[in-house]
Design a protein with these regions (language model features):
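Alpha/beta enzyme core
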Residues: 1-127
Length: 127
């Protein structure tokens, strides 16, 4: 895997996602598209959901994966990796980097962004 610092300075990261209801949303299809992207020059992929992250990690074990989990909650407009459960799910599935909503909006369980980041650093050893 390419060191994260190098990735952030150069290269192409391809977002490999499909909307709900799409026949392309199948984890095997997502993994195949991610592999094709990596074989053709992408240095990493951005994936949505633990299921897709896990499928790509199994198929492309050396891939740089930026993971997120889109979730809707009735009491919050935060959508991208909104809380601890989602952070933990993305990380456990095999993401190297966790993408999350970095706004100060109210999160589903009232968690603060700073607290979530601190917890991820401590419990997941995410830097």
């Amino acid at each position: 895997m390419i060191p994260i610092a190098e990735v952030l300075n150069k290269g192409l990261i391809v977002s490999v996602q499909a909307p709900l209801g799409s026949p392309m949303r199948d984890p095997d299809v997502i993994a195949a598209m991610a592999e094709a992207s990596l074989r053709n020059g992408a240095i990493g992929v951005r994936l949505e959901s633990p299921e897709h992250i896990g499928a790509v990690r199994r198929r492309c074990p050396e891939a740089l994966i930026i993971g997120l989990w889109k979730c809707t909650f009735p009491n919050s407009s935060v959508y991208i990796t909104p809380g601890w459960r989602e952070i933990q799910g993305v990380w456990s599935a095999g993401a190297d980097v966790i993408a999350l909503d970095a706004t100060e909006r109210i999160r589903p369980e009232g968690q603060l962004l700073a607290d979530l980041i601190q917890r991820a650093r401590q419990e997941l050893r995410a830097t």
